């Protein structure tokens, strides 16, 4: 028999709203900041919100991981221990931690995951963490496929969590102290000042300026959507989307994009299966180029790559739309390869290489009427759309539905009926009950399917159940309303 490996799509949540939408759009697990001591000080959440997310996620067997991944001070250990117990009591599935001192605390039986802030880039480090009791290890972003495969071969029983999308650090994770040194804000305390996104000038030994005011340390964003199968074959079990500071539309779009990619792989590769329950249906077509990015890179996954930097700007350019033709009065004409919409955000690099932008008030063919002053743009300047009004309008509404398939079988018994329910994961239950019935005047198959299919606002939808048609074509319950009460 083929051994199947569960594959987890792990999505970020800044808050409860983002967490719920991550679940709705296909996440198998969601990671979210604790009330304190997370590596994103601006993304903390109350115990009440985390508990609400746990309750919702567990309907679909989606796991909730809470980040407690800063270096702790001695005087914070007691408070940390108390908080971990509270997280355990509300049903959190695991903690993502950095400080090994946490393992010395009086902990509840809650799984620990080794944060990427631990600098996990060798088989020896992963083996050490596994031997110390860690259930999952988040690998460093800068590893190649070969390095990931070697770690998996050395530690085959340890689930490996690999980043597949989002921002990249120019330094080794957990080993960067430049923010602390320059600004007194430690990345290992959740207060990174984003030093690597600032502009710098490059001056040689003779004082000659080689490059002036460019973002020399700013990297593009990671995008491994086209090489997911390679990552799975190398041993990755958890595919992680970065973005605990991103907004809800980012979470919706990016999670849905990776869910769609993975489901297509699972349809071909039966040795890989998803790690949660339910089927997602989207009211939009996910597009990674529609969400925040600094341009995309595979980073070092397939070896050293020269095209990993975003020197011009650390901000989101978005999708390239065309080029500037000319300015006439209160509008611009463009040579476009894609259509703009009213309300779109447009950006471009001016003659000094600085990022500029404007909002479109009205579009008329290839004419753009900016809201406010008409910007001066040199002909043939590349134009980008970093805000798609139509796409964002779709994402602002309900944009996905997630349902678990369940089948009903109603069987006739001498004293009533037996109602059997089975879901898509193989969970099955039969309830027998006394119930009045009468001889049906017409076949009841379709009527029974209709009545039992009224599942309302639940996580479930009807699916066929194991070759069973109508449980009774000649008898019927006296009251379908009372019968349906047994469904719940």
PLM regions and their residue ranges:
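Conserved, mostly hydrophobic/aromatic
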Residues: 22, 99, 129, 162, ...
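Active-site beta->alpha loop and helix N-cap motifs at the rims of alpha/beta catalytic domains
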Residues: 49-50, 59-105, 111-121
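Active-site-adjacent beta->alpha loops and helix N-cap segments on the catalytic face
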Residues: 41-51, 100-107, 142-155, 248-250
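N-terminal basic/disordered segments at the start of proteins
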Residues: 5-29
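Hydrophobic faces of well-ordered beta-strands that scaffold small-molecule active sites
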Residues: 9-11, 30-32, 64-66, 95-97, ...
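Glycine-rich, proline-tolerant flexible connector loops at the mouths of alpha/beta enzymes
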Residues: 31-48, 68-72, 244-251
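Catalytic alpha/beta core domains of metabolic enzymes, predominantly
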Residues: 111-113, 118-234, 254
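Conserved small/polar residues in nucleotide/adenosyl-binding loops
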Residues: 481-488
